[in-house]
Amino acid sequence: MVDLRYASGNIFDEKVHEMGIIALGSFLENHGSALPIDTDAKIASYIALNVSISTGAKFLGVVIPSTEYSYVKHGIHDSIEDVITYIKYLVENGRKIGINKFLIINCHGGNTIILDELSKLNSKDCFIKMESVCLTHASTEEVSLGYAVGILSEDNMKTHDPKIYEEIGMVGLKEAREKNEAIDLEAKSVEKNGVFLDKTHGKSLLNDLITNYVEIVRNMI
């Protein structure tokens, strides 16, 4: 049996080796013209990997399936069961390498509907926590965050307009606006204020999110 050097490297506590970080987003979802269809997965992965590097917790990868409210039609999504099954796979394999606490960093609002099923995976020796970053879809904050991560096309901001792409701010998603008051309020804000790139805010927001998740890891170990 090999003796592993758990104290080696840039970690803040040996107990962090019992902690796993999972990214959750979406891979197939329209985000206007300036952001890619896998924006949520890339932002979640970027934050999760940086939190892993900063803390020493293990980055276990990104969940491939994603889900969504049935009335939000701006991409291709999967069932809640599909998402939970993939998370179970990561958790089961994480347990094999000594992980008993899992932090899921979710950057897709539709995935919040898995919470009830996700809670059923918890047990006395396995704890799973999901923390979400839910920004107005493809709008100012997400555009600015996408710039900070490095996935935004600044040239395409010229055509990144909800009048052209209905999913921006969900302005043109009539059914979603009718059935979800929060979505409608965000859409009205985008209609009133427009969408613009704020590079300074994007960098600040990214830094704040990473710092916040680092603190969550500290509190979980």
UniProtKB/Swiss-Prot annotation:
The protein's name: 2-amino-5-formylamino-6-ribosylaminopyrimidin-4(3H)-one 5'-monophosphate deformylase
Q: Name one GO biological process term.
A: F420-0 metabolic process
Q: Which HAMAP family match?
A: FAPy_deform (MF_02116)
Does the keyword field hold Metal-binding?
yes
In terms of NCBIfam families, this protein maps to: ArfB_arch_rifla (NF033501)
Q: EC number(s) of the enzyme?
A: 3.5.1.102
Reactions catalysed, as given in the entry: 2-amino-5-formylamino-6-(5-phospho-D-ribosylamino)pyrimidin-4(3H)-one + H2O = 2,5-diamino-6-(1-D-ribosylamino)pyrimidin-4(3H)-one 5'-phosphate + formate + H(+)
Chain positions recorded as Fe cation 1 binding sites: E29, D40, H108
Question: What keywords were assigned to this record?
Answer: Hydrolase, Iron, Metal-binding, Zinc
Q: Which residues form a coiled coil?
A: none
